């Protein structure tokens, strides 16, 4: 878990103390601790930054606290966090930079993937000039953090629109107010994207998850390499496999 200028020796309050089992999980670099491994906590606000200690009081790092989830803490740093919105902004920028070196031949890909980018509870996908985000934890839903997320995405990517996709069940579990999926910023919520040269229409306010299964991009291309004859794309959703197979097969049937 990286450290940077948003991390210092100053203390975030309040704190939680873990069981030996919980401390061992963190020391093995697991990013979560469950409620059954919290042995001391007191009057902690939902979504607060908390200092995390082992049973002997040793400082283990800083985490995001959930008052309702069985995943009580999600680690955000092995140091002490001074300014969560600034840290979130910096890590979004780092995630964008990292992907610029990896992503080619597509304008549709995941920019931020929660714990994988050291931003637990935040998902951001790029669909050409439309960005789609999901906020899944109390801490990421706090107004200053939300503002930092949107502002950083605007500055770094200059999108035509930013859409929030809401998972009602997750917000219920986190005891967050229910919101509709909506255009957060800009004027555009739909666009056209390309994966492996194949064009797809994208509507940020419709469909499953954040709108498409971006993790299947390489599988679409791989399937097309071996395709021939007649093909069936079952449970096809947007027809990702069917559209990739169509140029190679004599016929393709997509069924959803």
Feature annotation, model-predicted:
Residues 30, 227-228, 249:
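Short, well-ordered alpha-helix to beta-strand connector turns
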Residues 1-128, 188, 255:
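Non-catalytic accessory regions of SAM-dependent methyltransferases
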Residues 250-256:
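Short beta-strand element of Class I
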Residues 238-250:
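Conserved SAM-binding loop of SAM-dependent methyltransferases across substrates and taxa
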Residues 112-125, 146-213, 221:
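Non-catalytic substrate-recognition/targeting regions of SAM-dependent transferases
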Residues 83-106, 132-179:
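Cysteine-centered catalytic environments shared across enzyme families
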Residues 227-237:
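Conserved class I S-adenosyl-L-methionine
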Residues 47, 129, 219, 235:
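Residue-level signal for inorganic ion chemistry
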